[in-house]
Each structure stands twice: as structure tokens, then as C-alpha cells.
């Protein structure tokens, strides 16, 4: 993959250095193109009208300068999709379709996750600007692109930039696999700054935003960043959605393994819905992270539906 400096076309206007009657016949018609770079800085360049027309460059396009110093459209999305098609595996696509029901079958290319992670590293290294173009593009037509998007977000090292991209991406997540792949490492290092967003996500009525918020509590707030009051956040969720309740049960089962004394009252005092309560006990008893005595005690806390 080639490395480019990527710009966004903000405005295209006529070059006013010559009036219509003053332009010599042998002088090419030019346009003034206003660009912004990935950091938001603005610059203006002159480009031949016919080049802009032939290359179908319009305001809002992502572009780069070719070897002749002329603007060229940056087709990162097409390039990524073509590369993913090259890694397609129909057997794996069939398997993924079974794991994620409700998603249109044609959205699955079947790219394997290890291959996606390797490709994400290559993409981030060779074309950082291209990554930014891709991350600003949603929704994606392919499930594989959503997974790649989540993996790329996980590698962003600046908290504010990562949080902004996550916020923009969350409304487009439509399955548990992409939701659970999205685990930005920078969030673990910034749990205090992240907490207000986690509280907002957990309270969301949208299935996968809520699931993501509970997943953040599970991943980043049961160890050093733990506080007993955080246990109340998932308990306050009232949902009939399987993928929300399943994540809540996983959260409390993990909390039992890591923070038993603070968590067990939620079962002793029936603070959870019956389904989440019993599923929590099931998952905890299947775990190797709690003792046999604890498992036996949990068995006695099961509730009838």
C-alpha cells in the first residue's frame, strides 16, 4: 500500500488571475482549489480545469498530489474493499453468518480476524491518513469492514481522538461481534476521563451502545479502577434485548470472580432481573476463577422464573 498525504477538497473556484477576455489562447484554464490537511490546516493550490474534470474531483473528496503535482482522488475505500475481497473465505463467511443472525448474508466476506488484525497494522503503518478517511466513512457495506474499523479504533493512542471516533461509530454497530471487538487500549489508561461516557453508554436504549458500555465496565472497571458503586450501573438497565442482558450477566459473573464481596449482595438481595440473575450464576459456575465452595453457594441462590 502506498503512503500519501491526504487532503480534503473544501472549495473549487475559478482562477481570477485572468479575465475571460484577457486569458491568452495558449494558457490552460485553471481553478483554485482550497484544501485542508488531516490536522485542519488550510491551503490553496491551482489546478488545470480539465484535470479536475477528467478525474471527477469535487468538493468533499479526499485527494493527494500525484508525481506531476496534480490532484488525484484517493480511493482508499475501494482499495480496502478490494484487499478484503482478496482475503475472503466463504467457509468462514458461512460460519460468521450463523454466529451473527440478523445481518444480511451478502455483507460477509469471511475475512479471518487474525488476517484483519495484520491488515490493520499494515494499513495504520503505511497510510495513516488513509486510515482517517476510512474511519470517517460509515456505514460500511461489509461486516468485515466494520470489524476492521473496530480494530483500527483499538489502536488509536490519543484519548480524545479515539473517543470521538468511537462515538461516531457506535450508532452503526449492529451485531455483538463488532461491538465486542471494539476495545480501545487507550481507554484502559484513562478510566477517569472515560467514566462519564461509560455511564451515558450504559444508559442508552440502543442495544449495542448499551452493550458496549457494559463491556467497558467489564473490561476496564473490575480491577484497579473498580469502585463498588459501578456495580449499580448495569443493574439499573431495563431491557428485553438478549444481547444487552447477556453482556450484563457476563459482567456480574466476571465481577463475582474479581470482586466477590461487593458483588454477591446483588444476587443475595435479588437486585437483578430473574433472567440476568440466573444467567450470572450459570456463567459464574462455569468459570474456573471462583472456588467450588462459591459455586455451590451460588447454586442455592438460583431463582424460579
Put a short name on every predicted segment.
Residues 16-34:
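Short aromatic-glycine-enriched beta-strand elements
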Residues 58-64:
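Loop/turn positions that initiate beta-strands
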Residues 35-39:
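Short acidic, glycine-rich loop/turn motifs
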Residues 76-305:
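Alpha-helical scaffold domains
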Residues 1-14:
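Short coil-to-beta-strand transition motifs
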Residues 41-55:
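Beta-strand/loop nucleic-acid-binding surfaces
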Amino acid at each position: 500500500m502506498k503512503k500519501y498525504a491526504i487532503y480534503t477538497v473544501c472549495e473549487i473556484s475559478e482562477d481570477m488571475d485572468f479575465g475571460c477576455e484577457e486569458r491568452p489562447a495558449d494558457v490552460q484554464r485553471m481553478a483554485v482549489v482550497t484544501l485542508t490537511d488531516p490536522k485542519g490546516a488550510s491551503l490553496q493550490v491551482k489546478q488545470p480545469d480539465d484535470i479536475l474534470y477528467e478525474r471527477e474531483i469535487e468538493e468533499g473528496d479526499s485527494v493527494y498530489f500525484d508525481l506531476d503535482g496534480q490532484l488525484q482522488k484517493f480511493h482508499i475505500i475501494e482499495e480496502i474493499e478490494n484487499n478484503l475481497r482478496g482475503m475472503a473465505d466463504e467457509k468462514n463467511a458461512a460460519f460468521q453468518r450463523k454466529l451473527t443472525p440478523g445481518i444480511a448474508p451478502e455483507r460477509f466476506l469471511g475475512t479471518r480476524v487474525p488476517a484483519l488484525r495484520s491488515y490493520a497494522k499494515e494499513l495504520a503503518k503505511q497510510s495513516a491518513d488513509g486510515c482517517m478517511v476510512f474511519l470517517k466513512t460509515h456505514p460500511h457495506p461489509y461486516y468485515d469492514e466494520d470489524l476492521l474499523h473496530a480494530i483500527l479504533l483499538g489502536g488509536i493512542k490519543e484519548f480524545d481522538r479515539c473517543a470521538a471516533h468511537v462515538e461516531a461509530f457506535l450508532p452503526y454497530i449492529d451485531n455483538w461481534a463488532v461491538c465486542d471487538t471494539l476495545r480501545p487500549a487507550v481507554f484502559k489508561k484513562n478510566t477517569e476521563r472515560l467514566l462519564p461516557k461509560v455511564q451515558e453508554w450504559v444508559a442508552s436504549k440502543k442495544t449495542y451502545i448499551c452493550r458496549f458500555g457494559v463491556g467497558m465496565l467489564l473490561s476496564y472497571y473490575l480491577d484497579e479502577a473498580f469502585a463498588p458503586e459501578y456495580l449499580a450501573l448495569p443493574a439499573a438497565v431495563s431491557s428485553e434485548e438478549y444481547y444487552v442482558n447477556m453482556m450484563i450477566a457476563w459482567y456480574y459473573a466476571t465481577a463475582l470472580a474479581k470482586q466477590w464481596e461487593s458483588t454477591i449482595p446483588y444476587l443475595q438481595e435479588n437486585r437483578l432481573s430473574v433472567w440476568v440473575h440466573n444467567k450470572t450464576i450459570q456463567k459464574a459456575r462455569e468459570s474456573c476463577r471462583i472456588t467450588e465452595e462459591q459455586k455451590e453457594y451460588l447454586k442455592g441462590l438460583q431463582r424460579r422464573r
